Amino acid sequence: MKNQRARKKPGCWRLLPLQLIVGILPLITVYHQVHTRLNEYGWYSVDDTRQDFFLFYKAVFFLLLAVVMLVLLIRELGTQTGKERKSFFLTFLPVFCYLLLAVLSTIGSVDYGYSLLGMYEVMEPLPVLLGYGITAMYAYTVLRTGEELRLLLKPAVLGMSAVTLIGVLQFLGYDLLEQAWVQRLIVPGSILENSHFTAVFPKGMVYTTLFNPNYVGSYVAMLLPIALAAVFFLKERGWRIYAGITAVALLLSLLGSRSQAGVVAALAVLLLFVFLFLRQRVRRWYLIAPGVAVLGVALLVLGIRLDFPGWSKVAELFAAQRQEYALESIDTTGNGVKIKYKGTELTVLMAVSGSHYSYVVLENGTQRDITYTEEGTIAGFTLESGEEILVQTILYQKEEDVFVYAFQIMLDGKEYRFSNQLEPGNYTYINQLGRAVECVAAPNALRGYEKVASSRGYVWGQSLPLLTKYFLIGSGPDTFALVFPQNDYVAQYRAEADGVIFTRPHNLYLQVGVQTGVLSLLAYLACYLVYLAGSLRGYLLRRYTRWEEWFGCAVFLGTVGFLVAGLANDSLIVVSPIYWLLLGAGLAINRMELQVKETEGVK
């Protein structure tokens, strides 16, 4: 009896971790100096020191909350009946499978350090992934009444309003984070003179406290339905007006972020919201729904025509055509530099003897004649097609006061530099950082579409083949940067991504599939399918009679927004904790509604 009374009593303190996740976590912005440890790789800078303002302390704060939630979750489960615990474990069986596979992936990780402590620009190591699962389970366990949902809704609105206030100001050209008084809050005084925050995005582009404009798109698509729910269902008029202003600020932030994924996801969510609203409020909703869909498409086309920020990028997704390139690939091997160029296969070799050097060039196995300039520093050869290609001899500084011979070739509008004097028996490519690395021609599932979606075609195309390699347990949490072919410099050039280090695949599903394995991706999707099944039954197939059903619908739409945006964005500590909270809250609301229907005798 005592335990039952404890469960019925609305404990506001139990909601505090969830309130902090939706209200405070996205706002945390504090300076942290990171040593990436990536300088051991030739494709990264020798200097491994970077500044982080948006990720590290968000992760620390979240992990502290996760520990608290785990303790409280164990306590809550201890008060439940055997039937309730059985229902809990069955509901979260896919989550347990996903987390188990994440643990196994960490055990087999290509780098334990990153999988346990986190990667620069990502910060989703194993402890954070476990925290996501704990968040969903905790939300499911402690949210039991409509009043508790309202207690969670208000901090969410406050958090959204703070995040979007910064965003709207950035949209108007005033970046609050660059102001001196804010700098003193987020950067320790001892290093303020030498280190300060400087935005890397153009003036007027919104990134707010979410690290990157892409995640503004995910944030808005996920929380816009929640803001709209607050407009209609908070009891106090002042709160409803405040929520309405916040919803407008969310849309302005989305517009300023120029996030194409966010635009598509938010539009999908809004159309689905209108569809569900019409179904509930209009008798012959099925006659109006097609018109709403047409209106949505018209708005999208209008946005593209008027060149709204980021909207023209959406059009590119549907109009993308395969591009052909003269330079197909470059491989540095022990037997020369292998080049596929305009349908021919070239092999370039350099012979060095003291201060003398010479070249041998093979085209499809046939040696070409070489001519040298009077100075001898430039060699030329003519292809069967009649095109002349020049090879220029240069000096490369191997060490202080130590120089060796290297050569550069202009191909398809770009100079490529090589040497066989840096690694015994091997040719190496000298990248834009001046570091000697192997140049590879990595498998690419989307060859010719590298520029699609702001060069996402490049990273997607080279990530897809990794799924077969890491099918079972993945490469390990936060190790994408280590297994992605960062040294396919020809593909980089085609994608206009020279020098860009990809720490994430810009796709939630590829991120999960590569890092923790395709099996874990299936478990991840199963986590949502469990929720989706109950939501479709609850929100599409019957009319709403209680506000909890409307709020549950908003939560459902929020999760849809996150997953749609995930087609072009990744999971990141700035937004993912809120998604997992919504997933747990949505499951809790479905449970509440099922209990109500059972009580009313409705099957």
Feature locations, PLM:
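Alpha-helical transmembrane segments of multi-pass inner-membrane proteins
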Residues: 2-31, 58-75, 92-112, 125-401, ...
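Short, hydrophobic transmembrane alpha-helix segments
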Residues: 30-37, 45-55, 77-82, 235
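Interfacial/capping segments of alpha-helical transmembrane domains
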Residues: 33-45, 175-188, 474, 484
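Juxtamembrane membrane-water interface segments that cap and precede transmembrane helices
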Residues: 37-54, 112-115, 193-209, 458, ...
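Interfacial loop-to-helix junctions that mark the boundaries of transmembrane helices
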Residues: 42-60, 84-90, 119-123
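Extracytoplasmic loops and strand-loop junctions of Gram-negative outer membrane beta-barrel proteins
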Residues: 119-122, 444-449, 546
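Extracellular loop and loop/strand-boundary signature of outer-membrane beta-barrel proteins
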Residues: 122-125, 138, 448, 497-498
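TM-adjacent membrane-interface loops and short helices in multi-pass inner/ER membrane proteins
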Residues: 212, 351, 415, 421-502, ...
